[in-house]
């Protein structure tokens, strides 16, 4: 093969890889409650959303990565319930106890169905922090414990986002929004 042909193939492969990296499907991975895990049962059946068929996403379940059907939720995050509520916030919560729900679709407008002291009720969502979580690579080492230090962005200090890692969800410095756009542009320029 000529060097020009080899270079062209390499650039095409890199372009396809970069495009695959940025593919994220709509919807969310279903909630998962961690139980004791036998690490011998760990499986990596997908690497990212692009490796899953149709609308399925690559979701972490314990130490395994599986293609799963997503849950459809409204934008934003449920607010974190605090024990130090002001009287006006407490009054608002009591009013909301009359508006129970099962899913986001049961709430009017932009409100989300969130856990509260009176069950599932409708709340106005908290916005996710800007930026993009880094891609998850590898699997959690056998000797390292697997756990979440956060569930949502609003539980992370400063600009950090709550992102998946090989060993659970952690507060992480995100890539800026422009990072994804500049990667797409460089891929197009390379082709």
Swiss-Prot record:
Domain WAP as annotated: residue spans: 22-71, 72-125, 126-175
Pfam families according to UniProt: WAP (PF00095)
Disulfide bonds: 29-59, 42-63, 46-58, 52-67, 78-114, 97-118, 101-113, 107-122, 133-163, 140-167, 150-162, 156-171
SMART domains: WAP (SM00217)
Xref: Gene3D superfamilies: Elafin-like
Molecular-function annotations in GO: serine-type endopeptidase inhibitor activity
PROSITE patterns: WAP
Recorded GO CC terms: extracellular space
Keywords assigned by UniProt, alphabetized: Disulfide bond, Glycoprotein, Milk protein, Protease inhibitor, Repeat, Secreted, Signal
Presence of the UniProt keyword Secreted in the record: yes
Glycosylation site residues: 69
InterPro entries, per database record: Elafin-like_sf, WAP_dom, WAP_four-disulfide_core
Annotated signal peptide: 1-18
Record-linked PANTHER family: PERLWAPIN ISOFORM X1, WHEY ACDIC PROTEIN WAP
Protein name: Whey acidic protein
Organism from which the protein derives: Notamacropus eugenii (Tammar wallaby)
Taxonomic classification: Eukaryota, Metazoa, Chordata, Craniata, Vertebrata
